[in-house]
Amino acid sequence: MALSMKMRANARVVSGRRVAAVAPRVVPFSSVARPVLRSTFAPEVSIDIRRAGRSRIVVEAVKKSVGDLGKADLEGKRVFVRADLNVPLDKKTLAITDDTRIRAAVPTLKYLLDNGAKVLLTSHLGRPKGGPEDKYRLTPVVARLSELLGKEVKKVDDCIGPSVEQAVASLKSGELLLLENVRFYKEEEKNDPEFAKKLASNADLYVNDAFGTAHRAHASTEGVTKFLKPSVAGFLLQKELDYLDGAVSAPKRPFVAIVGGSKVSSKITVIEKLMEKCDKIIIGGGMIFTFYKARGLKVGSSLVEEDKLELAKNLEAIAKAKGVQLLLPSDVVVADKFDANANTQTVSVEAIPDGWMGLDIGPDSIKTFQDALADAKTVVWNGPMGVFEFPKFAVGTVAIANTLSELTPKGAITIIGGGDSVAAVEQAGVAEKMSHISTGGGASLELLEGKVLPGVAALDEK
């Protein structure tokens, strides 16, 4: 159930997802990155570094992690770290309005600094048009990162060239230098080999901790690995792989996936992939109306992808053939217009009135979905149940969020797979009760789809 264009324009992006503009906040450190030591989704072994009450898992890591490097590997070494510091900034003051991504980078940075490394940190910020723009400089990050690390963060106004070489030459063990926005060079997104070589020229080894851009083959995420060895995953990146890849590869059962959002077309691959592993798939959001129309039901003025009707039929047939329960809502909350203050009514999906549009799932559907989740041991959620940005139509999404928050302490692994569902659990106030909340948007989806992420594939194997 899509946001209006106006609402999208007034929203801001946080950790790969879009949320309504709110006052600046500080996210509890425990909700972001945690060092992950090993990585199989085997419940019989525990990782004690996670918060008490969480399901404990271990995942057999394929890629080498920064945790595999000790003091002997790091002391005095120049370590090029690619993080995701693409934080939202106030348009007028350029003050950071949400520091989640900075906090997520801290465990890796502290580990490197504590082991005597000379850290060269870089990121992208915003969408500069192939050259320096003051509003996209990483300068606002300096003060907050210094505060979180408890030490001075130095900065240079470039990411390659003489000024960087000079700054690196004077860097001491246990110090951090923040390089400028890599996207000030158009060669970054083109994965230009010469640019990658220049980025790598001032370092001895590489750490990628930017999961949000791991699905992009850019110079700072993929190209530099050809010139720096070892090239390893940071703690945040490793944790994302442990949960998102591990959940699909070897889940505790029953395994339930919740897939929401406005369009079937954007979730086709992930639904097909999840059908190979899931016991149940719950479908919500605007995409349900494409399924209903494919069944021959009237959907009023609800969102429908007319060219995906056959696809919806096929997905239901595949689920049946595989013995996977595909659950769609039995009732919906409809509105006479797409507006926060619209007139509403709750109706059966077989009785949607002409001219009305479905914007949330109904109470019967909520109960059905809660029953389906009751015995779940692994849950992956990607996409809201309705237009949760409007309070009238957030009931279904909030109910599902609360249900998952109750499952986690009972031993279930609850994974929020990026995108709007992250904003939804935060809005519901239960983010801290989930096993894992992904910091990636597109990267999360591609990993769940079973795709190879270039930024991960380029890293060294154990």
From Swiss-Prot:
Its main location: plastid. It holds the Pfam family PGK. Monomer. Mg(2+) binds at residue 420. GO terms for biological process: gluconeogenesis; glycolytic process; reductive pentose-phosphate cycle. It catalyses: (2R)-3-phosphoglycerate + ATP = (2R)-3-phospho-glyceroyl phosphate + ADP. ATP binds at residues 267, 286, 358, 389, 420-421. This is Phosphoglycerate kinase, chloroplastic. CDP binds at residues 261, 285, 383, 388. The keyword Kinase applies.
